[in-house]
Design a protein with these regions (language model features):
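Short Pro-Cys-Gly-centered "Cys-loop" motif that presents a nucleophilic cysteine in a tight turn
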Residues: 1-17, 26-155
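Histidine-centered active-site/metal-ligand motif
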Residues: 19-21
Length: 155
């Protein structure tokens, strides 16, 4: 829905209980993250309220955002963030493994050609990890191990 209205890359998405996580890469000379999120939140509220017969405000607060490219090591931070998002439903007891989550976006980085009902664009940082998709996926798993061991990488 939103991806056909606005031009952006959705690099990660996961639904967790009462909230969701998105990693959105805006594109030069296209719409802002604020406009994209306004649309997503408005449509989500409309659909939920209609489906449940609810009226009134749906969201508690404005969305939170971080500019990944402004971190000291954007690539390391991006990969750590993907695993943080992937493991969020696991920490909440909603799944046993990020690969089994409701959306399961992490599989797009582990299985070449993996498709979901929403379009996930594999981030270009991922392709810098190796010469082939399988090599990139293997190296990407290093970040899962680091995340699970709570190793702070340099970002």
């Amino acid at each position: 829905m939103c991806q056909s209205k606005y031009k952006f890359e959705l690099n990660a998405a996961e639904i967790v209980g009462n909230h969701f996580h998105l990693v959105i890469r805006t594109l030069k000379d296209e719409d802002t993250i604020s406009r994209i999120m306004q649309f997503i939140k408005a449509r989500t509220a409309e659909k939920y309220n209609k489906a449940t017969g609810r009226v009134g405000p749906f969201w508690n607060e404005r969305f939170g955002s971080t500019i990944i490219e402004e971190s000291s090591n954007p690539e390391e931070y991006q990969f750590w963030l993907f695993w943080y998002i992937g493991y969020n439903p696991v920490k909440k007891g909603e799944s046993r493994d990020p690969r089994e989550n409701y959306i399961g976006f992490i599989n797009c980085y582990l299985k070449e050609g993996f498709e979901l009902p929403i379009k996930i664009t594999v981030h270009h940082y991922f392709y810098r990890l190796g010469d082939s998709f399988s090599e990139c996926a293997k190296r990407f798993l290093f970040y899962e191990d680091a995340y699970r061991k709570r190793i702070a990488l340099y970002f």
